[in-house]
Regions:
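Beta-rich interaction/scaffold domains
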Residues: 1-113, 453
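Kelch-like beta-propeller repeat domains
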Residues: 90-453
Length: 453
């Protein structure tokens, strides 16, 4: 029996003639979960089983590669080769399988009200924002998991992240970008990054936070300080005067460059204006790609497919029935954009998340909201797929218990499984589901896995 580092147990099948033991584990198993497995061997007829001369119960093993188990009895020894195989098919994953109804039951604190998830180097990383009303305390933490359900905190010397911070993998490093700390006093005693003049509120944040890691444990501060006087550096100027969209930025990679759509900014005492600007990393700052400006919309879905950037849906201005968009635009160089479809079978939608399979040739759309015939906001429970970003089809046979959310976090692992975390269950505002009041936000903590086909 093989027990993984997360406590899951699987029984191997012995082939006596070939002297092999094969243990098949679920498709959702990550290689990182197999790095420290324990073994239980039930031997017969006083047979002893060892590894390198030691009893197997005394060791843990990296079972990403086969190991040899010598079995000795009455002076004779047979060498059995144990191989762990990650299944490449699982029927219930095609329809979707709920991995967790609430990831806070597996190590994420109960006070978390916002989080985002990345998949990096075989592990999941969650960047959380928590708040305890009793003492007005805020907590910004990093957690890691090998299976998406059991989470362990990553201890960092500095506070990383903030409400609306978003991760991206670029150049073999994991980045977490943006976010604000405007609710409560953080764990280092820093006051909220918000000020009020009696009739309106504004951010005091003058830094675009960016942290990176190459190993998941050692983090480097790559934050960019704003400067409102730099008229020749628009990014630093916007950051410096507090008018940049820090909350819910959309980072992505294209043509070996790091891009980012701005998130929601603070204006007139509220968050608004999501996805209004497209930026590309340029040394120690970002440069705006103005060619995308007329195609961007609030909460549009931006993704890369077949070596192109696509922009789908979104809302013109506030989120309303007449403002939702249906068109699709794309770009082959990240500079010049064009409309390639006025509408799709997805229909008017905003807040959907689109990812591609690891081959980069098929896109999948999750979540988002639309308006029904009665004019009510409805979360999209369908999952769509497309090979060209224009023609979309509904994937049939999806688990009826799956419910879509607004702006879910979707990551694709090496097994071509899409892991869907969180998002917002409802959207009651006009511009963004984010608020300066925790009780006004309605996050989901469910996690699902879907095999991409």
């Amino acid at each position: 029996t093989v027990a993984t580092s997360e406590g899951a147990s699987y029984t191997g099948v012995i082939n006596q003639s070939a002297l092999t033991i094969q243990c098949t584990v679920p498709m959702t198993t990550q290689p990182s979960e197999l790095e420290a497995c324990s073994l239980t061997v039930s031997a017969t007829m006083n047979t002893s089983v060892t590894v390198n001369g030691a009893a197997v119960t005394e060791e843990t093993f990296d079972l990403n590669d086969p190991i040899v188990l010598p079995a000795s009895y009455d002076g004779k020894t047979k060498d059995y080769t144990l191989t762990v195989v990650i299944s490449n098919t699982e029927d219930d994953l095609a329809a979707g399988k709920q991995i967790s109804a609430d990831i806070r039951l597996g190590g994420i604190p109960q006070n978390v009200y916002d989080y985002s998830v990345a998949f990096f180097d075989g592990k999941f990383y969650a960047f959380t924002s928590g708040y305890t009303a009793a003492d007005s305390a805020a907590y910004y933490q990093v957690f890691t998991s090998t299976n998406g359900t059991r989470w362990t905190e990553v201890n960092t010397p500095e506070i990383i992240g903030g409400m609306g911070a978003r991760p991206v993998v670029f150049d073999n490093k994991l980045y977490v970008m943006g976010g604000v700390r405007a609710i409560g006093t953080d764990q280092d005693g820093n006051a909220p990054e918000i000020e009020s003049n009696g009739w309106s509120s504004s951010l005091t944040l003058k830094t675009f936070r960016t942290w990176s890691t190459g190993n998941g444990s050692t983090w480097t501060d790559e934050s960019i300080e704003g400067n409102s006087t730099l008229t020749d550096d628009m990014f630093k100027m916007l950051v410096g005067n507090g008018s940049f969209g820090f909350v819910g930025v959309t980072p992505f990679t294209f043509n070996d460059k790091l891009y980012m759509e701005s998130g929601a900014m603070m204006a007139f005492g509220m968050f608004q204006g999501s996805n209004s600007q497209l930026w590309v990393k340029n040394d120690t700052t970002y440069t705006m790609e103005t060619g995308a400006s007329s195609f961007l919309r609030s909460h549009c879905s931006t993704f890369t497919l077949n070596d192109k950037i696509f922009i789908l849906g979104g809302a013109r201005g506030y989120v309303g029935a007449t403002n939702l968009q249906t068109s699709v635009s794309n770009s082959t160089d990240g500079v010049t954009f064009q409309t390639v479809a006025d509408s799709t079978k997805v229909g008017p939608i905003c807040g959907a998340t689109v990812v591609t399979n690891k081959e980069g040739n098929t896109a999948y759309l999750f979540g988002g909201l639309y308006y029904n015939e009665e004019g009510a906001r409805v979360m999209n429970n369908n999952i769509y797929k497309s090979t060209d970003g224009i023609e979309w089809t509904v994937i049939e046979g999806i688990n009826p218990q799956y419910t879509g959310t607004f702006s879910p976090y979707v990551v694709v692992d090496e097994n071509n499984i899409a892991w869907v975390f969180g998002g917002f269950k409802t959207f009651s505002g006009n511009y963004t589901p984010y608020s300066l009041t925790v009780d006004e936000m309605d996050p989901s903590f469910a996690a699902w896995a879907f095999a991409l086909n």
